[in-house]
Amino acid sequence: MRLRIASWNIRGMPHPTDQLRLLDDQHADIVLLQDVGPSAVRAVADSRLWNHVMDTWLLPRPPGAIIRRGGCLIAATDDWVLLPVLPVQHVLLSSRSLAVTATHREAALTLLSCYAPTNAGPGRKERSGYFSALAAWLSTVSTPIVLGMDANGPRVDHPDIEQSRWWTEEEALVLGSGAQTEDVLRLWYANHPTELKRRVRYYPNGPLADSYHRGRKGKCLRCRYDSIRVSPGISVTDVRYLYEEAVRAGSDHALVMAELELA
């Protein structure tokens, strides 16, 4: 079964018409969004581009949960049935992540949309715990996983993952080698060495794609904070990072697209 996945930090969706048009143009079966507020949820639902929509604002929150401006949203076409699965007892995960079980005939997936704390302000104290908790939860999942994430990292997305640099060492539990899921862009590059060689020629220290520009104009640093990750065994046939298109539509993060082949 072939599946088209979109993952995007929509920055609250300040321009819903433009951002929804860009998403619609990609013909995604499943959409994983981050930094989603109630107005963005309404815009996605009212667009009727997807038949099923779930978001962190609808789910019960545990005591102590922080009500953030941005949550997460997962939407799917009519072929899929969505049921929430992320345990709400973990305060940090419940406020920054959304997980659902998605079924289509005999196929079943665990879908996650995750919005990691930044390495600045209050997020700096939360970041290590978030990645540790997420890695622990991922290790308990028995169904194949598709994860869309604004990880606000790594600090350096090196072509050799062993040379990537992290804001906190716990990031590697989710994003590094040996994690429960694999980066679809690195999987795609493994099967397209000529494309990897071309990228590394211009960016020998990374990033492997542009998804976010950190710093001030004129002195910005290209970063790849956004990614789609999958369980081993899920094949990747195409990956695209639509940075310029996403910025024109109203975000400051790339829209990440992946075409997957399920066994």
Predicted regions and their residues:
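Active-site beta-strand/loop signature of hydrolases that rely on acidic residues for catalysis
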Residues: 3-10, 19-44, 100, 111, ...
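Surface-exposed cleft-lining segments at the edges of enzyme active sites
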Residues: 87-88, 114-131, 155-161
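Low-complexity, intrinsically disordered Gly/Pro/Thr-rich segments
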Residues: 235-246
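Metal-dependent phosphoesterases centered on the DNase I-like endonuclease/exonuclease/phosphatase
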Residues: 30, 44-46, 50-53, 128-232
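Short proline/glycine-enriched turn/loop segments at secondary-structure junctions
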Residues: 63, 215-218, 245-249
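Conserved beta strand-loop-helix elements of the APE1-like EEP
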Residues: 33, 66-84, 203-236, 260-262
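Short, solvent-exposed loop/turn segments at secondary-structure junctions
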Residues: 11-13, 37-39, 80-81, 105, ...
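Structured beta-strand-rich core segments of catalytic domains in phosphoester-bond hydrolases
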Residues: 30, 36-119
